[in-house]
Amino acid sequence: MIENIDTSLIDWSRAQFALTAMYHWLFVPLTLGLGVIQAIMETIYYRTGNEAWKKTAQFWMKLFGINFAIGVATGLILEFEFGTNWSNYSWFVGDIFRAPLAIEGILAFFMEATFIAVMFFGWDKVSKRFHLASTWLTIIGATLSALWILIANAWMQYPVGMHFNPDTVRNEMFDFWAVALSPVAINKFFHTVLSGWIVGALFVLGISCWYLLKKRNTEFALSSIKVSAIFGLVASILIIWTGDGSAYQVAQKQPMKLAAMEGLYEGGNGVGLVGIGILNPAKTSYLDNQNAFIFDIKFPKLLSFLAERDMNAYVPGIVNLIEGGYTTNKGTVALSAKEKIEKGKTAIKALADYRKAVKDKDTAAAGQYRVTLEENFPYFGYGYIKDPAELIPHVGLTFYSFRVMVILGCFFILLFIITLIWDKKGKIANTRWLQYVGLWSIPLGYIAGQAGWIVAEVGRQPWAIQDILPTSASISKLNPSSVQTTFYLFLILFTILLIAEIGIMVKAIKKGPEAAAH
């Protein structure tokens, strides 16, 4: 299935996909969050008949439209890369992966594409009720798009509802609902959408604070701040619940990722959660005797509780996961990395032997090889791993990204609470420090979201599909120079699109809500 491939090709293919995904995620969360906020504002207008709320909704709707258009462009490129750069992946799991993507394209995207036209051009042309319904259906469509994409991503983290067909050398879906309703998929959807809501709330809050700093459109700004702060606080509180669920699912399904998130090399019972820490750069191998941290502050036993819902539960570290021998939460003894690698090689060899036996029409031998393949298939991907150290993701990047996400999440809760208190006291319009904090918090939501995706994707390495297909076995056999060329072309293109969006948005913001109403 995989030949000798230049490692530079793997690195450049990963870099290109990461570039596209991270640029795409600059636009998606604002679509998810701002879309709901504008729909809430239009709902207030529908219920009250207050024209000020209509102008407010129209202004944020204009910024939503600018962002939506750029997000669609980057998303299309991202989907095409599966076929161009990751053809082995596309072949091996295309039967499963393409199903949610197809539903996203046929149902969700066309739904939002249909109603967005009414939302933008239907003011005073259709009834208030129909226009409001179109606005809500547009954001529901966008959210459903996110749902199916996240189901596909969750399946890569936790592959279920499929079986391997040795005759086609492909994984084939046999239970659609197991894929769509897996606990990882459900939790990932809510966690990701809530993060988008927070980005939208911070965006509205920050732009509104800019108007207050400029002493412009004060009533518009104050009403927008109130809606965004309430919305953002609700999302920030709910995301704690989904974050806890994410940590639990990672502990159950991807223990190596959890160990990297915590810089945990030696596991144990009653393990503490690192609140703040500085990793020891001298620790370059899981085999050395260097301490993992130069400095750290831990919450006693909290990691054990997050991972197993038991303050004294055992949580394996990186060394334990590599060496095996510990008792898992299912009561079984964990295999070592070397044992898994041997089982993976056995599965790969059994597949080759099975296909040869089928070709030779040796039914008896084919049956034996198939049994061997099925017994060892859960470790199929390990057969492509050459060194157990390859199973360890980048600890530093995963560890620090996780803390950036969590610390910023706590900051957002504090910001929204303070904003609502100041709003209740009628102080926001005259509190310039809070206005500056609100304005400069806009990029922090994006940083938190990007950090979360780094934890999810870097922490999963070396796997494209957990335990089944490593990233190194997923790529297309291309000339590395061609991938480098398209990497830089995409970098230039995406940067131009980003600059264009920011420029158009800044121009619209400077014109103000009065211009958006015409």
Model-derived segments and their meaning:
Residues T48-I66, F92-R98, A102, G122-I140, ...:
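Membrane-interfacial loop-to-helix junctions in multi-pass inner-membrane proteins
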Residues G65-T74, W136-M156, G232-G243, V358, ...:
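Hydrophobic alpha-helical membrane-insertion segments
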Residues A117-K125, F130-W136, L147-M156, M173-F176, ...:
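Internal alpha-helical transmembrane segments
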Residues A152, V234-K338, E342:
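Aromatic-rich transmembrane-lumenal/periplasmic boundary elements in polytopic membrane proteins
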